[in-house]
Amino acid sequence: MDGRALPDAGGESAGGESSAAPVILLADAATDVERALVKQWLSGAELRPSAVLPLDSQGLDRSLAETPPDTMVTAARVAWLPRQRDGDGTAGWPGVLPLVNARRPPSLWQARIARRDPGRARVVLAEPATVAALRERWGGTGSFAHFVSRQARLALERAERPLRGYRYKVPRHVVEAIEDSPQFRREIAALAARLGSPESKVAELAGTALEGLVASMSPLAVDVLSGALRPLHARAWEVQADTAGLERLRELNRRHALVFLPSHRSYADSLLLADVLADHDFPRNHVLGGDNLSFWPIGPLAKRAGVVFIRRSFGGDEIYKFALREYLGYLLNKRFNLEWYMEGGRSRTGKLRPPRFGLLTYLAEAVEMGYAEDAYLVPVSITYDQLREASAMAAEQGGGAKKSEGLSWLASYARGQMNRIGTVQVRFAEPLSLREAMAGDGGGSGGGSGDRDAWRLRLQKVAFEVAVRINRVTPVTATALVTLALLGVRDRALTLGQVRRVLEPLRDYLVQRDLPHSGEALRTDDGVRRVLGALAEQHVVTIYDGGVEPVYAIERGQHLVAAFYRNSAIHYFIDRAVAELVLLSDPADRWDEAMRLRDQLKFEFFFPDKESYRSQLSAELAQLDPGWATADGRAVLDGSHLLMAHRVLRSFVDAQLVVAERLAAHDPAEPVPEKDFLDECGGVGQQMLLQGRLHGPESLSRELFSGALKLAANLDLIGPGGQDMARRRRDFADWLRDVVARVITIDEIDAESRREAVGVEP
């Protein structure tokens, strides 16, 4: 059955034409008022059923068995509509505060609504299906009457959508539907054989796992949760959404499920995206997240509003993995949209974190196994002018403990969101067909080890492509440009004019490359002053105005926060920074050096494939000097109006240098315990900063040290090992010292050429 809405009286018959075939009408009416409304509607409609039965009638089995195969089965119910609030169909606070479901009010309320406001009581009719068609879809498992009743409820839900809005797409009887499917039973048998466990036991455990995973989508819970959590973001930011991108997605969503994969910088990300989608009448996403946010009372409410809480760790639990894949496959098959955050947690540095592949693996397997024809991945960029939680994340990077989530944490977070701090931009990148992206010459996920390795490699490339597309639509904010300018100056303050002269070539570069940005706000003194003032209000920038004119600098202790804002945009400048470093290498070795730098930075930034990278870097080098391959690199940089390596890369290569030198100092025969080693890097890094060997405190980031350690592991430098490893560790540290020296040289060239702008002697 499919669904459609009909007028509350005098409507057409289902399908819009009369038929000689008998019709069974299943009435989903729980109260006397609803039964009377359905009866009244039926008296004025053209539909003339041969039988009218309650939806859960005990006699339905007999009626279906005795009726001809061409008998049409349809269903009707009363759709109770909430009062309009601000022109939409969501239940307002008066309807949700007493926890009364405005979409299924108590019988005492129903009579009053039908009498005083009859437009809120609309009868909807499901699109009919023949008994023969229903038997064909049944599959032979369980009661046929029970199957028909369930299909009728689903069809009625579809019939209500034009009235309620498409944001309310509600899954029903999910666990039951999954367990009744022939594919589920086949997979259970195969899994039981692999595990050597009784099939009944595996089925029981899988059912329990599904019960824990499956989220309902109560419209009341959606409205209550949205109303309760809206203060966490509504006052803090003005939302600017990519409406053109949404319209493209709407058409695609008619045929396929969409999987929204946003960048993750704030707890508010999912709330903002949900509001943007609801405002444009998209169905609410099933949001997959960690069970750390399932605390009472938000957790139980969120689970009823489409939030799927997943265990943080389930490494060897094959039954849980199976249940998760089956659930994702079911949601894809029914075209429910999904949402999760591939980075696995909020970015502590402001740039995208490396993606995690677990959920994407199960999704790709579900598509490959035929649960859905395809799913489209939608990269989403959510970019903030400012974030109050950036300070807490910066403290974590300095070694502070993360505050656990709970009611007191939520209250504190809400208090911090009461005042406006800027704009948030939500942009949608070009969607990616998962089936097409995973197509390859190798076998599928279930092939041999070689096929499986090739499949995993394709999956990683898909995840990286999502990240590249997010970066491609992420706008460069005015905040990012201002912090980029101020962090490039060591321990100095700048006048307003000096800040503007640093910003001008940055804006010109963005315009020349046609990159998305809000740099127009920085074209005037007033615009720059406003951005600096907003940063000063949040104690990121300090202003001294006791002299001839105000001067601006990063507030002491706020360098990691400033770097957070800067890092949201630096991916646009990486090619330029690498090109500058390449020019300071031996001309005979420049392409090899470019590839070495790409490998050095690949754990921090997302690069395209090597051929694309070579093409992009060639264009950047040619912009610096058409004869770059043999040119005197120092002379080329001396004549450049824009130098970026020291502003973009210094904190990253400084952190790598700390890690490399500590590894070189360690006995190669001893293991390197990650936590203790990162603690050591933090302590020694602070000493190096005090000695002037590091540029600034933004290098002392636990996340940057962790990325550098992953780089070392990729180079097989972690050990344990022998003297060869000790030598390779020393070589690694020497090479990084050379890279840092080149970055410092570029800093000195920039200071010399812009002495009057930056106030720094070379």
Show which residues each predicted segment covers.
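Membrane-interfacial terminal anchoring regions of lipid-handling membrane enzymes
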Residues: 1-762
